[in-house]
Amino acid sequence: MSRYTGPSWKQSRRLGLSLTGTGKELARRNYVPGQHGPNNRSKLSEYGLQLAEKQKLRFSYGMGEKQFRNLFVQATKIKEGTLGFNFMLLLERRLDNVVYRLGLATTRRQARQFVNHGHILVDGKRVDIPSFRVEIGQVISVREKSMKVPAILEAVEATLGRPAFVSFDAEKLEGSLTRLPERDEINPEINEALVVEFYNKML
C-alpha cells in the first residue's frame, strides 16, 4: 500500500484524528467525508477497531504500509519495555518526525519534504532519508543555504511550544532529541495495544 498523498483534511475526518496537529480539519465537521458523513459512524468489529487504530497511527506519521509494518517487526526484536511503546519510540526517532517536533516544519509531511530536498543536516552532514533513526544528542540543523527558506522560517515562527524531550536554538536553527519521550508525551489519542493486536494476527 503506497503512502497517502491526497488532502490531509479528508483523511483526518475519515480517521477522526487531526493529521496536521492543528485540529482545524475537525473543528467544523468531525465526521467522515461524503454525502452521509454525519450518519456514517457504524459500529466497528474487533478487527475493524484494530485496523482503524493502526491506520490512525500510520497516517499520523505519513508512512506507507510496508515501511510501517517493517518498523513494527523491528520493534518486536527489542528485548526491554512493551512492544507497543517501543514501536512508537521508533516512530518518534524518525528524522522527519524529529524535524517536526523541533518546529522546523508545521507538519510531518512538510518535514519529510524538507528532508527529501536536502535542507536538513545531522551532526553537520546532509541526510535526505526521512526514515533515518535519530540518536539522543545528535544535532539536527538546517543547511546554511536553506536557512532563509521562507517555509522553514515561517514554521519556526509559528511554533508556540516544543515537547520537553527536545531542545532547540531558534537563532542557529538547530536542536536535538535530549531524551526518549514518555508515553504520555506522545499521541495520547492512540491505543497502541490495538495496533499490536492487529499485527500479531497479520504476522
From Swiss-Prot:
What PROSITE patterns does the annotation carry? RIBOSOMAL_S4, S4
A GO BP entry is: translation
Any one cellular component term from GO for this entry? small ribosomal subunit
S4 RNA-binding domain sequence ranges: 93-156
An example molecular function term from Gene Ontology annotations: rRNA binding
Keyword check for Kinase: no
Assigned keywords, A-Z: Ribonucleoprotein, Ribosomal protein, RNA-binding, rRNA-binding
Gene3D superfamilies named among the record's database cross-references = Ribosomal Protein S4 Delta 41, Chain A, domain 1, RNA-binding S4 domain
Can you tell which superkingdom this protein's organism belongs to?
A: Bacteria
Question: SUPFAM superfamilies of this UniProt entry?
Answer: Alpha-L RNA-binding motif
Checking InterPro entries in the record gives: Ribosomal_uS4, Ribosomal_uS4_bac-type, Ribosomal_uS4_CS, Ribosomal_uS4_N, S4_RNA-bd, S4_RNA-bd_sf
Q: Where are the transmembrane segments?
A: none
Q: What does this protein do?
A: One of the primary rRNA binding proteins, it binds directly to 16S rRNA where it nucleates assembly of the body of the 30S subunit.
Oligomeric and partner information? Part of the 30S ribosomal subunit. Contacts protein S5. The interaction surface between S4 and S5 is involved in control of translational fidelity.
NCBIfam families with a match to the protein in the record: PRK05327.1, rpsD_bact
Family to which this protein belongs: Belongs to the universal ribosomal protein uS4 family.
Q: What is this protein called?
A: Small ribosomal subunit protein uS4
Q: Which organism is it from?
A: Streptococcus equi subsp. zooepidemicus (strain MGCS10565)
The uppermost taxa in this organism's lineage are: Bacteria, Bacillati, Bacillota, Bacilli, Lactobacillales
